[in-house]
Every structure is written in C-alpha cells, then in structure tokens.
C-alpha cells in the first residue's frame, strides 16, 4: 500500500522546491523530451506559474529517494495555464467562484533514473518507480492535492490530459467533467474539471483500498519544513543537463 512505502511532501522550503523542479527536468526534458534541456542549464524545469503554485514531491520512506511530483496552481494566478490555450468551454466554470478553482499540472513519475543523477548518500538522490507501482504513486499524488485543495476551499481543478488518461482516472472512481475541446499540446489533450469532493466520495464507494487511502487524510502529505533538512538536500542531486540531453 502507498503509505507503507512512500510519502508525499509539500515543498514549502527552497530545498524541496528545487527537488521538485529537478524531478520535472528529468521527466519533461530527459525522459519525455517535452521541453528543451538547453533552456534549463541548471537542471531545473520551471515556468511562470510556479510562484502561484503549491508543489508536492513523492519520496520513498526508507531510502528518501524522490520519485515523483505534482503541483496545484492556486486561484490567485491571473490565468490558469489551460485558460491561455483557448480550448475551454465558456460554461466550464460557470457556477464556481474563482477562489474555488485550481489547476493540476506537472504530474511526474520517474521511470528511468541514470547513474549521473547521484552524488552523496543514496537517500538524497532521485529514484524511480517500478511499473507495477506507478498507479499507486499516482493515486498518492492525487490524494495529496485533493486533501490540500479541499482544505483551501478548492472544489474543482482544471487538468489538461489525454482522453485515455481521463478514462483511467474514471475507472478509479475519480470524477472528471469535460471542460472544452481537444487541443494540440504535447500531443492531443483535452481540458477537464476534476471534482475534488465528488471524487473522494465516488472513489471511496467504488474501491476499498481507495476508501482506506482517503480515510487516512492525516497521511496525505506533510510539509518539508517538518522534516530534517539533512534528509532533503537538492545539492546532492548531480544533474548534468548536457549529458542528460545526449
């Protein structure tokens, strides 16, 4: 079960925020090739929405290796990323106040770490997630942003995903509503609204393991400021962008 092996950390310190960006760099620039590594010479992928977002990192409990990430963009931003793409239906958020909206993005799960990523103790490096545990880690990330979002009064979040991924989430019992038309953004993707409160109820009713997971709300995440800084050291992640891109 997720909580036995992993934990989600809310990155509320410069150190863990740097790790969040390093995970994004590895997944978006190295693994998937979505972004140009040369644009991020420090090995940290970032954008203008980071200042208005809450970042989360998944790490292994025993080793301390960081293996995944997600962010929740808060409603204080002028425009959510999906709003800049011109793909939303005009009635997508008609009955919601702005402060009840967010956007989920930069969902990252590391699949293929390389030797050049490590320097110093292994517990301080980046790890990877076995294929058979990817869904488990995804659900752990979803729980973290769902619990945090509801605590902040956020009821729905935009997500820009493939229709196949939306169907996968639906099979888990998570509730998504189509919010517009497909758009070409790193491939064809569609905007959806993820209904936080409805998803907790639906997934809990559909799946016993998810019911137990959401019931352990206190374990959804903990703040990095509550963790010994010696176990979260971004300087221990030796990332050579030029080598990674080769």
Tell what function each PLM region has:
Residues 1-45, 55-62, 66, 71:
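Short amphipathic alpha-helix that is part of the acyltransferase structural core
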Residues 16, 165, 199:
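Short phosphate-engaging motifs
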Residues 38-44, 49-55, 80-93:
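Short acidic (Asp/Glu) patches
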Residues 52-54, 68, 100, 188:
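Residues that flank catalytic or metal-binding motifs in active/ligand-binding sites
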Residues 76-193:
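Acyl-donor binding region in acyl/amide transferases
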